[in-house]
C-alpha cells in the first residue's frame, strides 16, 4: 500500500501556481490511495539511493551517452544563448539540464564560465555528470527538483545573488517521451507511470495510482485544470467505468479508454500548431503528468529560487510549452503575485475539501496582488520558434521564450 503520509506531505507543501481568480469545487478526495501488493513489491524492489542509481547508469552506459543526448533536440538554442549573453568568468545555472543541449551551446559561446547543471531526472543527472568529466572546470552536476535547488546550492557553497544567468527549459524531455518504460507517451505502450524521478521516491504516486484511486469529480478537475480539457467530465466518467472492470495500468490502455468516450471520427480531429492531427487523449496525458510531478508548483518555487540566486543585472530565461506554464512565468516577471495567505492551488483546494485537510488551513478567497517590480523584460513580447526550428524539431512548435533582467 502506498505510504499515505507522503501523499499528504506532498500536497501540504505545495505553493500555489494556479493563478486564476476562479477556483473550481473539486469534491472529496478519497480517504486513501490504493495500490496492489504487487505494485508495492515493485516499489520495494526499486528502492535505491539517488547517487547509486545515477552512478550505476554512468558506469554501465558510458558509451551510450552520446546516443542518449541526441534523443532530445534543444529548442530555440540561438535565442537562449543570445538572451543569456554569457561572458568570460560568469556563473550560470541550468535548472533543467536534460541532455545538455543548451548547456553545450552556452559553453560553445563562452567556455570560460562555471555552470551548475540541475535536473530531477537521474538519467539527465548522469548525462550532466558525464559532461562534467569533459569540462571539469566548468560543469557542476546536481540532482534534484526545483524545490530542492536552494538547499543543493547552499550545500555546494553557492550564495544568493551569485548567478549571472539562469535557464529553465520546462516540461517533458524527448528522452522521457521516447522511453516507453517511463510511461509518458500515449503512442508507445508502457506502464502508466509518468514520474520524472520515481526511482528516487518509490512511494510517489504514479499516473496509474491517480486514475485508479481518485473519484470522478477529482479526476475531472485535474483534467480540466492541468490539461485544459473541455471534455473533462466525459473522460473522467469513462475512466471510472473502465477501472470498475479492470485496473488501468498501461499507457495505451488509458489512451484507448479516453478514445472510447468519443465517436471514432473525433479521435484525431484536434490539430496542433502545425495543423497535424493529435490524439484525443493528449491533454489527458498532459494533465496527469503535470499533476503527478507537481510541475506548476515546482515551477513557481523554481522561479523564486532563480530570483533569489541571481545577482542584480542577472538574466532569467524561461522556455515554456503550454499556456499554464507560460501564464505563471509571465505573471511572475510582471510582479503579479499571490501571497501564501491567499493561495489555493487545485491541490490545496483538494486538501481543504477532503478529510486530509488540516483544521488550520486557510480558507480565505484568492486575492491577486501586484508585488514591487523586480524584473526588466528583455523582449516586450514572448518569443516563438522560427519556422526552420519547427521543421527541424516539431516537438518544439509550442515553445514560448520569456527573458528578463533582475533589477
Swiss-Prot record:
SUPFAM superfamilies: Putative methyltransferase TM0872, insert domain, S-adenosyl-L-methionine-dependent methyltransferases. It catalyses: cytidine(839) in 12S rRNA + S-adenosyl-L-methionine = N(4)-methylcytidine(839) in 12S rRNA + S-adenosyl-L-homocysteine + H(+). It is found in: Mitochondrion matrix. Gene3D superfamilies: Putative methyltransferase TM0872, insert domain, Vaccinia Virus protein VP39. The gene is METTL15. GO terms for molecular function: rRNA (cytosine-N4-)-methyltransferase activity. InterPro entries: RsmH (IPR002903), SAM-dep_MeTrfase_MraW_recog (IPR023397), SAM-dependent_MTases_sf (IPR029063). One of its GO terms (cellular component) is mitochondrial matrix. Changing residue 298 to A: Decreased methylation of 12S rRNA positions C839 and C841. Belongs to the methyltransferase superfamily. RsmH family. It comes from Homo sapiens (Human). Signal peptide: none annotated. S-adenosyl-L-methionine binds at residues 100-102, 119, 146, 169, 176. This is 12S rRNA N(4)-cytidine methyltransferase METTL15.
